[in-house]
Amino acid sequence: MALFQYQALNAQGKKSQGMQEADSARHARQLLREKGLVPVKIEEQRGEAAPRSGFSLSFGRSHRIASDLALLTRQLATLVAALPLEEALDAVAKQSEKPKLSALMAAVRAKVVEGHSLAEAMGNFPGSFERLYCAMVAAGEASGHLDAVLNRLADYTEQRHEMRSRIQQAMIYPCVLTLVAISVVSILLSAVVPKVVEQFIHMKQALPLSTRLLMSASDAVRTYGPWVVLLLVLAIMGFRVLLRQEKHRLVFHRRLLFLPVVGRVARGLNTARYARTLSILNSSAVPLLQAMRISGDVLTNDYARFRLGQATDAVREGVTLHKALEQTALFPPMMRHMIASERRRARRHVNPRGDNQDREFSAQMTLVLGLFEPLLVVSMAGIVLFIVLAILQPILQLNTLMSM
């Protein structure tokens, strides 16, 4: 969905303005008419499509969004502790230096002025405030501790942003190293090796096996290289199209979770996110079944989300939380034993386990990247060494013949 800024006339002919989420401008006008408003002007706020999943506002890129949301939530938590909610929202809207963020908070404030609760007002913008956010705000309003809940939300958002940034930074060096390695080997085989080997061919000298293998590899790269690249691009595009189908995506995500090394990292990422989300929802007095359902929805792996949905159904039928999580085969034994069947014990133990899961996931990422980087360097060095030896061997043989 997109976010539209509108100006409209109400039944009394007074002008009003605000934000409306809709699939299109036509849909936005229809929604405004259903509210008894006559649209005068509607402008789409670019870059504000609602994400499929994740915990973010919908203006701009995700790594900026998380920090914006954390700052907004922190400011709101500070203000609601000392000011009425309407004044706090007005102050946050005016404080923001980003027009789109300011307009959204003004729209939320307008809903609150109309008589909606803060959670209901934010729920009118699902592309900006997720179910997790709205559920926690609703729990905070019901318990009378909205400021404390908002502070937990800010902490949660910052931790999510920090983990995402850590993963991205950790992946930069291996990706760059891989691209450089492929580029260097391709240039050597397609441009350098043919010119050197051509001199040996003119000498009509019997070439060593390594040199003949190098010549074959060079010919293959020059002849079939562009086709291989084209096939790879087509394969990636086809794979992406295939993953758009739910049944194929579910099978792929299931296999991904149980691969030897990558699977452990993927499971760690998803279980850490689930534990962290369940922790913050439980501590905010959100009902357990609702907390489990929302915690599953924030996961990026479809199979993990499916299995945890089954766990939620099992708990609804009377199975203990410990047993339901055990049946998913996703969580490590220590976590299953730390989470009790009753919500009271879950509220006590999930939070530290969420911290443990974050630490374990970071350790797993460090281990995987620590193994990958030296393996890539050694492989690159081995290939370059083979190329150098394949070129030097005929030269050394030629020098030997000339000395004889």
Swiss-Prot record:
One of its GO terms (cellular component) is plasma membrane. GO terms for biological process: protein secretion by the type II secretion system. It is a multi-pass membrane protein. GO terms for molecular function: metal ion binding. Ca(2+) binds at residues 97, 151, 155. Keywords: Calcium, Cell inner membrane, Cell membrane, Membrane, Metal-binding, Protein transport, Transmembrane, Transmembrane helix, Transport. Pfam families: T2SSF. The keyword DNA-binding does not apply. It is found in: Cell inner membrane. Residues 193-222, 396-404 are periplasmic. The keyword rRNA processing does not apply. Residues 1-171, 244-374 are cytoplasmic. Type II secretion system is composed of four main components: the outer membrane complex, the inner membrane complex, the cytoplasmic secretion ATPase and the periplasm-spanning pseudopilus. Homodimer. Interacts with OutE and OutL components. PANTHER family: GENERAL SECRETION PATHWAY PROTEIN (PTHR30012), TYPE II SECRETION SYSTEM PROTEIN F-RELATED (PTHR30012:SF0). Component of the type II secretion system inner membrane complex required for the energy-dependent secretion of extracellular factors such as proteases and toxins from the periplasm. Belongs to the GSP F family. This is Type II secretion system protein F. The lineage of its organism: Bacteria, Pseudomonadati, Pseudomonadota, Gammaproteobacteria, Enterobacterales.
